[in-house]
Amino acid sequence: MNTVRVTFLLVFVLAVSLGQADKDENRMEMQEKTEQGKSYLDFAENLLLQKLEELEAKLLEEDSEESRNSRQKRCIGEGVPCDENVPRCCSGLVCLKPTLHGIWYKSYYCYKK
């Protein structure tokens, strides 16, 4: 039983003394690993940032095409009176003087082109 304890103690002492690394070596190794990790993280961050900027540019481009200012404002439908000088007929319609059945009305109406 004593030989087992002595053997175990001897192996333990050898493992501790031979396996113990220098603290400075450990620190240097950890610093190198963290620097490599930081450079990888910086690269990944820059790549992600570029992709996000591309997506944002596409979204802003689509928004500018479909913004409220570029939409057609309220318009007058077919068969509705309109102003001859400032026609607000919807697209595909023209402000014209009525023919035949609408002659007695003295205003213009929106008709299909």
Curated annotation (Swiss-Prot):
Residues cleaved off as propeptide: 22-74
Keywords from the named record: Disulfide bond, Ion channel impairing toxin, Knottin, Secreted, Signal, Toxin
GO cellular component: extracellular region
Tissue expression summary: Expressed by the venom gland.
Listed InterPro entries: Toxin_22
Disulphide-bridged cysteine pairs: 75-90, 82-95, 89-110
Localization annotation: Secreted
Signal peptide boundaries: 1-21
Superkingdom: Eukaryota
Pfam families: Toxin_22
GO molecular function: sodium channel inhibitor activity; toxin activity
TM stretches of this protein: none
Domain remark text: The presence of a 'disulfide through disulfide knot' structurally defines this protein as a knottin.
Function of the protein: Probable ion channel inhibitor.
Family, per entry: Belongs to the neurotoxin 14 (magi-1) family. 01 (HNTX-16) subfamily.
Protein name: U11-theraphotoxin-Hhn1u
Source organism of this protein record: Cyriopagopus hainanus
